[in-house]
Amino acid sequence: PLFLVETMAPQLKITRLMCARQSFVKSRAPLEDNAFVLMEYDNGAVGSMWTSAVNSGAMHSQKVRIVGEKASIEWWDEHPNQLSYEVQGEPARILERGMPYLSPNALADDRIGGGHPEGLFEAWSNLYRRFAIAMDAADRRDEALLADFWYPDARAGAFGVRWVENCVRSADNGAC
């Protein structure tokens, strides 16, 4: 889920978070099957992330919402090809994957064009493709490409582990 948050708003840095987690299915305890995370960012924006394996009607749901001063964005894995973009005082806009109005970065991992749903295999394929591009650039010492090329590297993995640890610490301390 953190990967989704970072992909949606890579320029934002999380400064504070608060987590609540639950184990609704007792046989899964002590592992949680539902969690809510509230996040504050360095520019004053706030975000929320909800992940659940028990939300009736939404199997293994993950929802990410980031709220800023002027606009909000929301992504939900039940509608993975859509991103809701909501500007204050305007109707919500649904941005569809693969459409020409998206930025080149948004289109870079599009495999089969808009209107056709992509899935888990394409997502993994995109990650492996990005790893391969980064490894090739590193072998060629192409610092220019690596400076602007985003992929989940070891730093992202370590940050993700720290993020989960902070979520656990927050929930264990009864932050909610």
Q: How would you name each of these model-derived features?
A:
Residues 1, 128-132, 164:
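A general structural signal for well-ordered alpha-helical segments in protein cores
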Residues 36, 41, 70-155:
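C-terminal glycine/acidic-rich active-site capping loop/insertion
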